[in-house]
Curated annotation (Swiss-Prot):
This is FK506-binding protein 2. InterPro entries: FKBP2/11, PPIase_dom_sf, PPIase_FKBP_dom. Its EC number is 5.2.1.8. Belongs to the FKBP-type PPIase family. FKBP2 subfamily. PROSITE patterns: FKBP_PPIASE. One of its GO terms (biological process) is chaperone-mediated protein folding. It is found in: Endoplasmic reticulum. The keyword Endoplasmic reticulum applies. PPIases accelerate the folding of proteins. It catalyzes the cis-trans isomerization of proline imidic peptide bonds in oligopeptides. The lineage of its organism: Eukaryota, Fungi, Dikarya, Ascomycota, Saccharomycotina. It is an enzyme of class 5 (isomerase). Keywords: Endoplasmic reticulum, Isomerase, Rotamase, Signal.
Amino acid sequence: MLSQIWILFTFMVCVIASKSKSDGLKFEITKKIPISKCKLKALPGDMVSVHYTGSLAENGKVFDSSLRRNEPIQFKLGAGQVIAGWEQGITGMCLGEKRTLHIPPELAYGSRGAGGVIPPNAVLDFDVELVDIARN
């Protein structure tokens, strides 16, 4: 019985660890693409297109959304064009996958905040969907 409990505990730790990065980024896969249908995963160097909605974790206030503009953001993954939490959270996503990224301040805008909309030291939540990958 004790060994079964230990196995269950170990499994739960592995599941939790697989969904967070060691440096504080946490994410939840909200739309998983089956392995058999995941033909392309986002890798550094890829040009990716992402739909997103960003909100403040403390109160859920939405500060930006590409869905409102009906235009995904495009950027080169790994080139430092977006916050570090996005770089880490989008790497490895399958085309069509959706995730919720829970990004601590040190992987977002830190003590400076951003544009009068994101306060200093804010934890951010982003619902993201990988809509395109262009690989050279």
